[in-house]
Amino acid sequence: MTIDSGFNHITVLLDEAVEALALRADGCYLDGTFGRGGHSRLILSKLGPQGRLLGFDKDPQAIATGQALAAEDGRFVIVQRSFAELGAEVAARGLHGKVSGVLLDLGVSSPQLDDPERGFSFLNDGPLDMRMNPDQGISAAEFIATAPVEEIARVFKEYGEERFAGRMARAVVERREKQPFTRTADLAEVLKVANPAWEKGKNPATRAFQGLRIHVNNELGDLEAGLEAALDALEVGGRLAVISFHSLEDRIVKLFMRKLVKGEADNLPRNLPVQHKVFEPKIKLIGKAQFASEAELKANPRSRSAVMRVAEKLR
C-alpha cells in the first residue's frame, strides 16, 4: 500500500520490505503491486546494470506511472496484469524458476482510496465503482443492483467480517427497490443507519465497504493464486515478501507459508508410502512477522494494520 500525504506518496514498510528481499545486484525481481512505484524505485537504486525488475498492476494510473519509470530506466518493465497472473508473464519471458525475489504489497493504495472518482471511499462521495481496473469486471454498483440479498450478506460477512451483515444487506435491497445506488455516500448512509452498534473510532460502513471491494476485485482469490505463482517463479534461495493490511489477507499468507514450512505431509492420507523428500519443507521463514515502527505509525496512521511476512525458497 502506498500512503498519499498531500502530493507525496509514502510507501509502507519501504526499507524493511526491500531489505527482506536480500537483493543481488544482478538479480531479477518482481514487484507484484507497483502502485506508485515506491518499492520499485528503491529496488532499482540497489540493482546493478545487469539487474532486472518487472512490475505488475491492474490500475491504469499506476501503469502510467510505471511507463514513465520504464522510459527512464531500461532495467524496469511494467505489465498491466494482476499479480495472480505473474506465472504466465514470467514463463513468457523465460524467467520461470529464475526470479530472485517477489514483493507483494496488498490492498488498496491511498491514491486510489482518496480519489472520490475511484469509488472506494465512504468518506468522499463518488461513483460506486471500487474496481482496481475500471475497464474490467463489474462495479460495486452493478453488484449491489443485481445480487440476491443472501449474496450481499455473504460478501459483507465473509470479506468484511461485518457481524450485522444480514441486517445491512436487507436494508440495501429494500432501498434499491425504490432507487438504485450509484454513489458511495448514498450507500454509506444506508449502511450507517442499518448498523445498530457502531465501533468507536470506526465508520459503521467500513467493514461492508471492505467486503464489497474485496469481492469486486477478487482480492483473496488473486492472493491465493499469486502466492502459488510467486513461489513457482522463484529460484532456490529466492525470497517472497508479502505485506498485508487486514486479517483475511494475513491469514491466507500465514497458512500458505506454514503449510510449506511443514512440507506436504499434511495433505496426504495417513500411512501412504511416499518418498522422504515429500515431507521436506519447501520454504523457510525469514524472521518473525514485521510491523510498522513507532516512527512510521506516527507519520502514516494507515500503516498501523500493516504486517509483513518473508520466506525463502528451499527447493
Swiss-Prot record:
Specifically methylates the N4 position of cytidine in position 1402 (C1402) of 16S rRNA. It is found in: Cytoplasm. Keywords: Cytoplasm, Methyltransferase, rRNA processing, S-adenosyl-L-methionine, Transferase. Coiled coil: none annotated. The gene is rsmH. This is Ribosomal RNA small subunit methyltransferase H. InterPro entries: RsmH, SAM-dep_MeTrfase_MraW_recog, SAM-dependent_MTases_sf. The lineage of its organism: Bacteria, Pseudomonadati, Pseudomonadota, Gammaproteobacteria, Pseudomonadales. The keyword Iron does not apply. GO terms for cellular component: cytoplasm. It catalyses: cytidine(1402) in 16S rRNA + S-adenosyl-L-methionine = N(4)-methylcytidine(1402) in 16S rRNA + S-adenosyl-L-homocysteine + H(+).
